[in-house]
A protein has these predicted regions:
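Catalytic cores of nucleic-acid endonucleases
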Residues: 122-163
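Active-site beta-strand-loop-beta-strand hairpin of nuclease catalytic cores
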Residues: 109-117
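Ser/Thr/Gly-rich flexible loops in soluble cytosolic domains mediating phosphotransfer, phosphorylation
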Residues: 163-169
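Short catalytic-loop micro-motif centered on adjacent basic/acidic residues
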Residues: 95, 117-120
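Short, basic, helix/turn surface patches
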Residues: 49-54, 120-128
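Accessory nucleic acid-recognition modules appended to NTPase machines
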Residues: 1-104, 109
Length: 169
């Protein structure tokens, strides 16, 4: 029995209360992602980042205010913010992870009939999995990389945008 089975009622309550939204694992990056989605493997993102921050230790908040936060904590907060913004724009959320190839994509959406992979970077801005997915899948013309930085476009189809530009996707 998976954790999703054990906590099914609690997860459903959180979903009905609109406190979280789910990002389902997909086993393939082809359109239609819903055909490859697994209901038993997912990430749960809060719909209210301020609630998440209220649950955190004061020292974490101090690091955020002083802009000295690094590592997984910063990346997790950024990823949650991006996922929440996409959810509020009406996109069903998916993520991709392949244990064999070690490729992973933070968030995947479908826009205008095309799969769009999205990476969220807080520190190391390399996006090897995104680059590989784009190279191996001709039907995915571009992908987004959201960073705490500036705009950029690479020859391999990666569009780099500052975090706040998620509003324009």
């Amino acid at each position: 029995s998976s954790a999703s089975d054990v906590y099914k009622r609690q997860i459903e309550w959180l979903l009905r209360a609109d406190m979280v939204h789910l990002c389902k694992l997909v086993t393939d990056v082809r359109f239609d992602l819903d055909d490859y989605a697994r209901d038993d493997f997912f990430r749960a993102y809060t719909t209210d980042l301020s609630l998440l921050m209220a649950m955190k230790d004061f020292s974490l908040k101090q690091h955020i205010v002083e802009n000295t936060l690094f590592g997984n904590s910063k990346g997790g907060i950024y990823e949650c913010a991006i996922a929440d913004a996409l959810y509020k724009k009406g996109y069903p959320l998916y993520f991709y992870k392949n244990e064999t190839t070690k490729r992973k994509i933070d968030v995947m959406i479908q826009k205008d009939g095309v799969v769009v992979p999205i990476e969220v970077k807080s520190g190391n801005t390399r996006a090897n999995s995104l680059k590989s997915i784009l190279k191996m899948n001709a039907d995915i013309p571009y992908g987004y990389k959201f960073v705490d930085g500036n705009i950029g476009v690479s020859d391999d189809g990666i569009i780099t945008l500052p975090l706040y530009m998620i509003a324009f996707i």
